[in-house]
A protein has these predicted regions:
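Short regulatory "switch" loops immediately downstream of catalytic or recognition motifs
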Residues: 1-2, 20-21, 202
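Bacterial N-terminal signal peptides that target proteins for export
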Residues: 2-16
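Short active-site loop at a secondary-structure junction
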Residues: 105
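Sec/Tat signal peptide C-region and signal peptidase I cleavage site
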Residues: 28-32
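Exported/periplasmic ABC-transporter solute-binding proteins
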Residues: 33-57, 63-65, 70, 74-80, ...
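Bacterial N-terminal signal peptides
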Residues: 15-25
Length: 262
């Protein structure tokens, strides 16, 4: 009799635990929000992984809107439905603060990027930087459009400091975002490509190529800022996401993609 009662009690305890877990799961789903996050192209692969981690932990779903920082800024200024903006630089988030399009006190630097020169053209592998840029073997050099793409602006800065930007103007192919520049290089439509370090690390076949380091004194620091927009202020999940981005686990993920975290 005692044994049967013990079995019944154990069964009841198990049922109660299962019901409790189901209740928590249901509540998480009921409270889950869709958060619209505008993400600079260089950060697309990291955010897709972070998105899954965030959903597992909180139940909230990130809807990613991807593009150059400049194009995302234009969307925001025109009333685009973006709750959080992860830019590839600092100027545009600061402008959103000035224009009162953001929640004050939410701007922060989530990563610092590095500019690299990269190629799949084996004929260039033995050349050194910056001499490689003036080689007769180089016909096409890809950079992001400096007007819209922060890594493109950094590329232009580097070329100007070396003193060859105008000389190379006929060879420059402008990409609408940094991912497009990388893909043009990967498809061998470019001899050289100025890309983010994260582009190279993210791509599983990057070992085929040659990477040239670009001295960081040739371009302004690429501090990538995030900020919450006014629509995000109404969503508890948006605040949770900003906190999640600065957690130790997420910082490690970001470092693994080639970014500097200070």
């Amino acid at each position: 009799m005692y044994k049967n009662n013990k079995i019944k009690k154990t069964s009841c305890d198990l049922i109660i635990k299962i019901m409790f877990l189901l209740l928590i799961s249901c509540n998480k789903n009921l409270l889950a929000e869709n958060l619209y996050v505008g993400v600079a192209s260089n950060f697309l692969e990291p955010i897709n992984i972070i998105k899954e981690d965030f959903k597992k932990e909180t139940g909230h779903n990130l809807i990613i809107i991807n593009g150059s920082s400049g194009s995302l800024y234009t969307q925001i200024m025109n009333g685009g439905p973006i709750d959080i903006f992860l830019s590839a630089e600092q100027k545009l988030p600061k402008k959103l603060e000035i224009n009162k399009k953001s929640v004050m006190g939410t701007r922060f630097t989530y990563a610092k990027g590095e500019l690299k020169l990269w190629s799949l053209n084996k004929a260039l592998f033995k050349k050194q930087f910056p001499e490689i840029l003036s080689s007769n073997l180089v016909k096409y050099i890809g950079i992001g459009n400096p007007l819209f793409v922060p890594y493109g602006y950094a590329s232009k800065e580097a070329l100007e400091k070396i003193g060859i930007f105008k000389t190379l103007s006929d060879k420059l192919i402008l990409g609408k975002n940094i991912n497009q520049v990388f893909l043009m290089g990967y498809s061998r439509n470019l001899d050289l490509a100025f890309v983010a370090k994260s582009n190279i690390i993210s791509n599983k076949n990057n070992k085929k190529g040659k990477i040239w380091n670009i001295p960081q004194n040739l371009y302004s620091p690429i501090n990538q800022d995030g900020i919450m927009l006014l629509s995000g202020e109404k969503k508890k999940g948006a605040f949770k996401f900003l906190k999640f981005l600065v957690s130790d686990n997420v910082k490690k993920r970001i470092r693994d993609f080639g970014y500097i975290i200070e």
